[in-house]
Each structure stands twice: as C-alpha cells, then as structure tokens.
C-alpha cells in the first residue's frame, strides 16, 4: 500500500495496556503482602528507638513549685486581659443599644443667619 493513504485496518492493542487474562491475587498472596506491610511498619517504629533525644535528659526532675508559680502568673495576666476585653465589649454594646445617648456633635446644615443663596456664589 502507498504511504500517502492511511491504513484502514484497526491498530494492534498494546498488550501492556490491555491485559485481560492476568490472574487475580489470591488470599494467600494478599495475606503475605499484609504481613510484609505490618513488619515494615513495625521496623519503622523500632528504628533508632534507643537514641537519646535532643534537649533535656529524661532523668532531670522538674521543680513543680516554679511551674505552678509561672502558671498562676500567666493565669492572672490572662484574667486581667479578659476583664479589659469584656469592659470594651460592654461599652460597645451599650452604644449599640442607645446610639442617640452618645456624645455626637450635630451640625447645623441650614446656617442660622446666613443667606441661603450665598453658598451658590
């Protein structure tokens, strides 16, 4: 056939793409793969388990009194900040409930003694 005309025959399928006759994985092989996966996970857990961590040693005892004092100071600071925040929120809520009672300076738009036509000039 001439190279100028395309072939009208169907293309041969790629056997790696369309392999319909491959065998299914049986239960024994699946169990073996699961066991290998579990041993792999266990080896990750146990890897370098005996190394000392960086930082404070495990045997160091902590002074509990100092920790409690620090926590008390932090709690008192947080409480005072919370009280200030609540006061601010209360002030905002009062203003939202009664907006006319606030100190708002009203502007006289008409101009008491001025001529109305003067602003056009």
Swiss-Prot record:
One of its GO terms (cellular component) is anaphase-promoting complex. InterPro entries: ANAPC15 (IPR026182). Pfam families: ANAPC15. Keywords: Cell cycle, Cell division, Mitosis. Pathway: Protein modification; protein ubiquitination. Residues 61-91, 98-121 have a biased composition (Acidic residues). Residues 52-121 are annotated as: Disordered. One of its GO terms (biological process) is anaphase-promoting complex-dependent catabolic process. The APC/C is composed of at least 12 subunits. Component of the anaphase promoting complex/cyclosome (APC/C), a cell cycle-regulated E3 ubiquitin ligase that controls progression through mitosis and the G1 phase of the cell cycle. The APC/C complex catalyzes assembly of branched 'Lys-11'-/'Lys-48'-linked branched ubiquitin chains on target proteins. Belongs to the APC15 family. This is Anaphase-promoting complex subunit 15. It comes from Danio rerio (Zebrafish).
């Amino acid at each position: 056939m001439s190279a100028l005309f395309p072939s009208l025959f169907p293309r041969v399928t790629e056997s790696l793409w369309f392999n319909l006759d491959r065998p299914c994985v049986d239960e024994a092989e699946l169990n073996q793969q699961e066991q290998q996966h579990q041993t792999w996970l266990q080896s990750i857990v146990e890897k370098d388990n005996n190394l000392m961590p960086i930082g404070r040693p495990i045997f160091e005892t902590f002074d509990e009194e100092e920790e409690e004092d620090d926590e008390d100071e932090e709690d008192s600071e947080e409480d005072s900040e919370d009280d200030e925040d609540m006061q601010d929120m209360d002030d905002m809520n009062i203003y939202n409930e009664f907006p006319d009672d606030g100190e708002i300076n009203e502007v006289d738009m008409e101009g008491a003694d001025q001529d109305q036509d003067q602003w056009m000039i």
